[in-house]
Amino acid sequence: MPGYSALEKQHLIALGTTIRQVREALGWSQEQLAERVELHRTYIGGVERGERNLCLLNILAIAEAMGISPGKLIDRAFPTRAADIPDPPGATAGDGGPANR
């Protein structure tokens, strides 16, 4: 993956691995996921191997197709990151802020 730092590569691999785990839990092939999100199977394979940098719209489409919220998908890929995000100023319990995802 030319141009990516070691940390960026780790992030791509973590998200790709999570997408693969969810896809496999659903019993879907890469081809089936690709058809549902109107992307090519080789793109999905590259994502799952951490070789492709997904744009936000593709993350949204993949998450929706798999029946998982984009936030939950990211939280599964980076479980310690969610706890590191401070609540926005004025956020209270139950308002849908990061602490309530």
Segments from the language model and where they lie:
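Conserved hydrophobic/aromatic packing and binding residues within compact polymer-binding modules
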Residues: I19, L33-A34, I44-V47, L73
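Short, charged recognition helix plus adjacent turn
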Residues: P2, E64, I74-R101
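A short, Lys/Arg-rich alpha-helix, primarily the initiator
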Residues: P2-A25
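Recognition helix of helix-turn-helix/homeodomain-like DNA-binding domains
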Residues: E38-L54
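Core residues of bacterial helix-turn-helix
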Residues: L26, V37, V47-E48, M66, ...
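DNA major-groove recognition helix of helix-turn-helix/homeodomain DNA-binding modules
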Residues: L57-K72
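Short basic helix-loop element that most often maps to the first helix and adjoining turn
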Residues: T17-R36, A61
